[in-house]
Amino acid sequence: MKSKKLYLALIIGVLLAFLTLSSWLGNSGLVGRFGVWFAAINKKYFGYLSLINLPYLAWVLFLLYRAKNPFTEIVLEKTLGHLLGILSLLFLQSSLLNQGEIGNSARLFLHPFIGDFGLYVLIMLMVVISYLILFKLPPKSVFYPYMNKTQSLLKEIYKQCLQAFSPNFSLKKEGFENTPSDSQKKETNNDKEKENLKENPIDENHNTPNEESFLAIPTPYNTTLNNSEPQEGLVQISPHPPTHYTIYPKRNRFDDLTNPTLKEPKQETKEREPTLKKETPTTLKPIMPISASNTENHDKTENHKTPNHPIKEDDLQESPQENPQKENIEENIEEKETQNAPSFSPLTLTSAKKPVMVKELSENKEILDGLDYGEVQKPKDYELPTTQLLNAVCLKETSLDENEIDQKIQDLLSKLRTFKIDGDIIRTYSGPIVTTFEFRPAPSVKVSRILGLSDDLAMTLCAESIRIQAPIKGKDVVGIEIPNSQSQIIYLREILESELFQKSSSPLTLALGKDIVGNPFITDLKKLPHLLIAGTTGSGKSVGVNAMILSLLYKNPPDQLKLVMIDPKMVEFSIYADIPHLLTPIITDPKKAIGALQSVAKEMERRYSLMSEYKVKTIDSYNEQAQSNGVEAFPYLIVVIDELADLMMTGGKEAEFPIARIAQMGRASGLHLIVATQRPSVDVVTGLIKTNLPSRVSFRVGTKIDSKVILDTDGAQSLLGRGDMLFTPPGTNGLVRLHAPFATEDEIKKIVDFIKAQKEVEYDKDFLLEESRMPLDTPNYQGDDILERAKAVILEKKITSTSFLQRQLKIGYNQAATITDELEAQGFLSPRNAKGNREILQNF
């Protein structure tokens, strides 16, 4: 039996040794594929503890092997101690380094219930219990010293609080002076008093008190006045000993509180009051000002308890003489308290006033509350993508140092004061990318002076760029947004899994990212109803557009949403090729793009004609009636244009007019535009397009002029790039700063493959016209006669635009465009130039 146990131990030891070497040398390839695989798995689940967990396990198994009976209570208790130690290390590693799948999973499960503080308390508790179990330490030897220290500390704090808030508080009366050294000192003094009392009786009319009761008094009630030295906490009245002492046995201090005689009005009759009256001008000297009045009251209480002394009228007349003494003592107390009151200095009040840290912006919450929320019905024959297709969110958070914020506030205020701009920081709020300081200037400061200091403040704060909102809409403060020293990555999965996105009932919900305090932010494309996006190279424009497209794919099946993607650069939308949501193949030719826009405008007219028959105003109302009448419902049709500048350069007015028509009338019929451009200049974003696309998103642009073109104000040139953007919500005049979420190409491919595996794409062949041409056999086309009329009009007016022919010949826009292309094919007109105009060929 022993040999079998030994062989089993050797096999386990060799196996653990091999696995330990695999964990150490897995990446070197010396331990084979299995070793590399095991090292990766071990590090994934245990993090850095994977280097020591197997040797630790081997040591525990060796202790179990040496034990005669491994199932005894002591062995099981030690095993539990080892297990708690390992778990505490896993939790600590996960909290500090975010390593180890086991610790991360447990921490994520416990965090919503107990928070970060509870996790650290749990870790400390596990470490303490493991330490006590493994080292066989009784709890008394560990906790009792700390309990005694804690009790002493609480007692001292309680004493200080009573001294601060109760002017009649006495240390001896409350029993706080019963330390061993004081007790010994009192016993010595009591022994001396005992000898004096034996030699000299107190009074002829009174019996000598019991010696045992005198010696057994440890409380301050038996404090006597000694001739040799003044007692602590008393006022030295006279160098001569008093004429009378009254000594009482030990009494509980709570008996005094319940004694009805103490609640009666005290008569201030003392036998030593004549001495006080005579000696006060020369011998009144407070030793402890705080307890002087308390001692006097205590003496009054003792004399009040003596029933053998008659009250004389002379004494009652002399008692008011104590008032000057009390006033003198109180004056000394007030002087000393005034000298020892540094906590009420102006410096302390100034340092205690700190800006308020804001976790949620009220203006953003108001915008989000205006969206529609509710339950969304899941499609029957289609499975929406899950967030599991996206990469897991890295929980590594860059905690913002409050000292860094305080330093920035000091630098900011000092720099503003150099320009004679006074004010104070009222609120601060920090997010994943920037920290915003709300600066309230003095009444004499002009806001325009602060706007011109962005470069100076950026240099002072060593920031890449700062953005100044002067002022913030609806507030009396100026917003100064400063980049954080360490920025966080915002993942698309965070936004899609947020409560806002999950509970949004609109199928056209767009995930825009996070706001400047780190809260998710979404919007509804139906309420925008169109979106104009601008941003230079590297600003994160493509990342933001991809996040919007993916959020639409996460909400809608193919029969509810159709997309028309126009990608003149041929690389931005190629990853979405052949998804079942596409109405046409991804359009890369500008001429085909113009034809697609014209077809969308024609589809809009068709929808409105059908909606007028059913007497409805919106697509939602039409779809409800269509479902009840068995008619095909209208899907939402989203046109996504990646580069408007190339389209405008090629098509000019021919591209501008259909975009304007769709933007003007497409909302009620379920047609929406998402138009992006890299160059938001005046010739690209024309006044007609700006007027019909009120909701805009601007990533970082090159100049202030571009910012004013896209946003009608500056500020976009000061953005940080990498998804940092400004958004104009519908119905408001203000700007909302957001940070777009990031999704990798691999994540997009996973989502696209998941969608394509469920349903194949079905393109509408009649929707996309070849080179924006209508067939010559259209119903309203009259052949060569109308061509001759078109030539005559062009030669007479010298105008070659399609819209001009449309007005002169009184035909549709699509037919006029077809005639123009036919004239170009015949050589009558030249191709469009850079401005989108055609010329009449002279050699015709």
Swiss-Prot record:
Gene3D superfamilies named in the record: 3.30.980.40, P-loop containing nucleotide triphosphate hydrolases, Winged helix-like DNA-binding domain superfamily/Winged helix DNA-binding domain
Record's subcellular location: Cell inner membrane
Protein name: DNA translocase FtsK
Membrane protein topology class: Multi-pass membrane protein
InterPro entries in the record: FtsK/SpoIIIE/SftA (IPR050206), FtsK_alpha (IPR041027), FtsK_dom (IPR002543), Ftsk_gamma (IPR018541), P-loop_NTPase (IPR027417), WH-like_DNA-bd_sf (IPR036388), WH_DNA-bd_sf (IPR036390)
Disulfide bonds: none
A GO cellular component annotation in the UniProt record: plasma membrane
Function: Essential cell division protein that coordinates cell division and chromosome segregation. The N-terminus is involved in assembly of the cell-division machinery. The C-terminus functions as a DNA motor that moves dsDNA in an ATP-dependent manner towards the dif recombination site, which is located within the replication terminus region. Translocation stops specifically at Xer-dif sites, where FtsK interacts with the Xer recombinase, allowing activation of chromosome unlinking by recombination. FtsK orienting polar sequences (KOPS) guide the direction of DNA translocation.
Residue numbers on the Cytoplasmic membrane side: 134-844
Name of the coding gene: ftsK
Family: Belongs to the FtsK/SpoIIIE/SftA family.
Positions contributing to ATP binding: 538-543
Record's subunit section: Homohexamer. Forms a ring that surrounds DNA.
All copies of domain FtsK, residue ranges: 518-708
Keywords, comma-separated and alphabetical: ATP-binding, Cell cycle, Cell division, Cell inner membrane, Cell membrane, Chromosome partition, DNA-binding, Membrane, Nucleotide-binding, Transmembrane, Transmembrane helix
Region (Disordered): 173-325
